Amino acid sequence: MVCVPYLLLLLLPSLLRVSADTTEPCELDDDDFRCVCNFTDPKPDWSSAVQCMVAVEVEISAGGRSLEQFLKGADTNPKQYADTIKALRVRRLKLGAAQVPAQLLVAVLRALGYSRLKELTLEDLEVTGPTPPTPLEAAGPALTTLSLRNVSWTTGGAWLGELQQWLKPGLRVLNIAQAHSLAFPCAGLSTFEALTTLDLSDNPSLGDSGLMAALCPNKFPALQYLALRNAGMETPSGVCAALAAARVQPQSLDLSHNSLRVTAPGATRCVWPSALRSLNLSFAGLEQVPKGLPPKLSVLDLSCNKLSREPRRDELPEVNDLTLDGNPFLDPGALQHQNDPMISGVVPACARSALTMGVSGALALLQGARGFA
């Protein structure tokens, strides 16, 4: 974490310790486009990261170690390096595998505030200690995309609101996977005015009730795409209720890779968001078309389920783009392939997708513009 290009400028005196007899932990490609650092050595040469200052994409893993030793540089004012930071090419930054004091993370964000960074990924991090007091105005980067995977925070569910205060407005894509807490105190959360894509996939313990707690009412007014793959969703009606409570109007909803149950006959009917046009229910274990789906759906993916018959036209009156591949009524061997992807030498589409989901833990979601200034 500490070796991001910006913080290097803050901590340069303590980092210039070059060892000629050790393998470089950082590698920069021939085009000076991508730089990857993996500090797994017991005594890492942090200064190797200096070469990453010319790259557009930077990925840094701290080898699972604590970065508390660098706290002494966290109070350095990055303004003195503003011109140098602005000149850096980096647009995408990934930081991972470290125990990071919250004070140090904030110092990095303050330095990044002078950069042209657009996409930030935090992965396998343990953020420790209290977060510094909220600034009078956001001093961090103007991100378009923020992705977090397996990041824990001492502050519990308050982490998103605290992190949000250090980011400039304008975030359009937010991905949160393997979160330790998604029960956000809504009073401490500011409105995500520009957020169009929210991906809460790969949070299998979330469930319908957890979604209700995560989607704070009126905080996502511009939301267009909501992804809930492998998020422990239980029924379409439960998801519908959470969307209604949050007063969001997504145009596209992904509920694939959840074991969905059919809504109970006596359940209260839910009114889906009127803007919803596309719904992904693939890999949901469905044996029949769920009742009470959004009435204005035009795109529906029911592939790789357990449907024994083709849906009737009156069940899906407005759908003109329907995907049914991998269901038993089309392929008698579909169930066997879903249960055992390696049953034959040729891996069918449904099995390939399931294997990909298992290996990656998530399908990368990058909706919205990738225009870098």
Curated annotation (Swiss-Prot):
**GO biological process assignments:** cellular response to diacyl bacterial lipopeptide; cellular response to lipopolysaccharide; cellular response to triacyl bacterial lipopeptide; inflammatory response; innate immune response; positive regulation of cytokine production; positive regulation of lipopolysaccharide-mediated signaling pathway; positive regulation of toll-like receptor 4 signaling pathway
Keywords tagged on the record: Cell membrane, Disulfide bond, Glycoprotein, Golgi apparatus, GPI-anchor, Immunity, Inflammatory response, Innate immunity, Leucine-rich repeat, Lipoprotein, Membrane, Repeat, Secreted, Signal
Sugar attachment sites: 38, 150, 280
Q: Which GO molecular-function terms appear in the entry?
A: lipopolysaccharide binding
Q: In which tissues is it expressed?
A: Detected in lung. Detected in brain and kidney. Detected in trachea and bone marrow.
Coiled coil (UniProt feature) = none
Q: Where does the UniProt annotation place the signal sequence?
A: 1-20
Provide the membrane topology annotation.
Lipid-anchor; GPI-anchor
Stretches the record annotates as Required for response to bacterial lipopolysaccharide (LPS): 288-373
Q: Where are the LRR repeats?
A: 55-81, 82-117, 118-143, 144-171, 172-195, 196-223, 224-250, 251-276, 277-297, 298-319, 320-347
Q: List the disulfide bonds.
A: 26-37, 35-52, 186-216, 240-270
Q: What induces it?
A: Up-regulated in peripheral blood monocytes exposed to bacterial lipopolysaccharide (LPS).
- Keyword Glycoprotein present in the record's keywords: the answer is yes
Output the Gene Ontology cellular-component terms: external side of plasma membrane; extracellular region; Golgi apparatus; lipopolysaccharide receptor complex; membrane raft
This protein's source sits in the domain of life called Eukaryota
| One protein family per Pfam | LRR_6
- List where in the cell it is found: Cell membrane; Secreted; Membrane raft; Golgi apparatus
Q: Let me see what the UniProt entry remarks about domains.
A: The C-terminal leucine-rich repeat (LRR) region is required for responses to smooth LPS.
Q: How does it assemble?
A: Belongs to the lipopolysaccharide (LPS) receptor, a multi-protein complex containing at least CD14, LY96 and TLR4. Interacts with LPS-bound LPB. Interacts with LPAR1. Interacts with the TLR2:TLR6 or TLR2:TLR1 heterodimers; upon interaction with ligands such as diacylated lipopeptides and triacylated lipopeptides, respectively. Interacts with MYO18A. Interacts with FSTL1.
Q: What does this protein do?
A: Coreceptor for bacterial lipopolysaccharide. In concert with LBP, binds to monomeric lipopolysaccharide and delivers it to the LY96/TLR4 complex, thereby mediating the innate immune response to bacterial lipopolysaccharide (LPS). Acts via MyD88, TIRAP and TRAF6, leading to NF-kappa-B activation, cytokine secretion and the inflammatory response.
- Please report the name of this protein according to its UniProt entry: Monocyte differentiation antigen CD14
